[in-house]
């Protein structure tokens, strides 16, 4: 009985995030590099990863000199991302919180997201309200319904808006 309870408690955070975004899928370093290459960001720009998982994209962004913010609901992968980004100090801020309830940081220039298709319209509304003028969105796998991406990387299913 205790074993089943422990298994349930371990699986619960991974299943819970499906209500608000997408399941945890690790991003490889090469994928993070390719993704960030698509964004026109300069050292010191504010970058946000909505559903930051294990912090792979944040590590790559911070290594480019970006000021990074990550939001992750799953406490296990959030803890991993905190550990992975310790070397960047105050350059990287990671929160175990629901990004739907928090405004984007001031002067956000770039946003990376992997969300399920059903959340993309809601994300578009949030970014229309909160993203800095000229800010960029890079979506992994899913497009915003009714909007044409400015750039598409079909090999990696990346869509830049």
Predicted segments, located by residue:
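C-terminal substrate-binding/active-site "lid" region of AdoMet-derived donor-dependent transferases
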Residues: 118-161
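Conserved SAM-binding strand-loop segment of SAM-dependent methyltransferases
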Residues: 88-99
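A short acidic, Gly/Pro-enriched loop at the edge of an enzyme's catalytic core
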Residues: 102-110
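Conserved class I S-adenosyl-L-methionine
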Residues: 43-53
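Conserved SAM-binding loop
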Residues: 81
């Amino acid at each position: 009985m205790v074993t089943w309870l422990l298994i349930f408690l371990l699986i619960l955070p991974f299943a819970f995030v499906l209500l608000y975004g997408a399941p945890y899928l690790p991003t490889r370093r090469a994928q993070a590099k390719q993704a960030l290459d698509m964004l026109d960001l300069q050292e010191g720009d504010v970058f946000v990863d909505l559903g930051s998982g294990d912090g792979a994209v944040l590590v790559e962004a911070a290594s480019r000199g970006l000021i990074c913010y990550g939001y992750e609901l799953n406490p296990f992968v959030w803890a991993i991302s905190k550990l992975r980004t310790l070397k960047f100090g105050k350059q990287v801020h990671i929160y175990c919180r629901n990004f739907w309830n928090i405004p984007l940081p001031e002067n956000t220039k770039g946003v990376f997201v992997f969300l399920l298709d059903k959340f993309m319209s809601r994300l578009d509304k949030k970014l229309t309200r909160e993203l800095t003028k000229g800010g960029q969105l890079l979506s992994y796998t899913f497009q915003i319904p009714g909007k044409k991406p400015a750039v598409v990387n079909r090999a990696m299913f990346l869509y830049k808006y």
